[in-house]
């Protein structure tokens, strides 16, 4: 996918979450290119083009053309479902307490019912709710 990002952020490998645009973007002729990503999703820049455009909202007053793709996301799944290469439907756990795994169990960029593939298997996690969880890297 092609999009535009502030020139100071336009670096291959940069991972970011797209939160949407400003109301000032509505009248811009580049808004379809800038705002063509899905809100709340995590992306990684895979290529940086030389083309830049003026933009009063960004730090250096310019945006740069970049290629992006959905980024992989670290999360936790039930250990019995943690098989590299398998496809799962992501669901946030229903926890009764907040713990050190909260950011892993509730990652930004994934929504309930997202169809994902397990790319990597990490360590088993200690869950205060007694669930058997394993850290994984998902693509969607």
Curated annotation (Swiss-Prot):
Pfam families from the UniProt entry: UPF0179
Q: Which domain of life is it from?
A: Archaea
The text of the family note is: Belongs to the UPF0179 family.
Q: Kindly provide the name given to this protein in its UniProt entry.
A: UPF0179 protein Msp_0996
Q: Which residues cross the membrane?
A: none
For this protein, the record's InterPro entries field holds: UPF0179
State the organism of origin.
Methanosphaera stadtmanae (strain ATCC 43021 / DSM 3091 / JCM 11832 / MCB-3)
């Amino acid at each position: 996918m092609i999009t535009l990002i502030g020139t100071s952020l336009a670096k291959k490998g940069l991972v970011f979450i797209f939160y949407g645009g400003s109301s000032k973007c509505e009248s811009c002729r580049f808004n379809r290119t800038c705002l063509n990503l899905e809100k709340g999703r995590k992306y990684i820049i895979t290529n940086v083009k030389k083309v830049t455009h003026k933009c009063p909202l960004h730090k250096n007053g310019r945006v740069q053309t970049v290629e992006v793709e959905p980024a992989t996301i670290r999360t936790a799944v039930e250990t019995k479902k943690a098989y590299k290469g398998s496809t799962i439907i992501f669901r946030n756990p229903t926890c009764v307490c907040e713990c050190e795994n909260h950011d892993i169990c509730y990652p930004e960029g994934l929504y309930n019912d997202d169809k994902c593939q397990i790319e990597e298997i990490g360590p088993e996690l200690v869950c205060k709710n007694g669930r058997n969880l394993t850290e994984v890297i998902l693509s969607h």
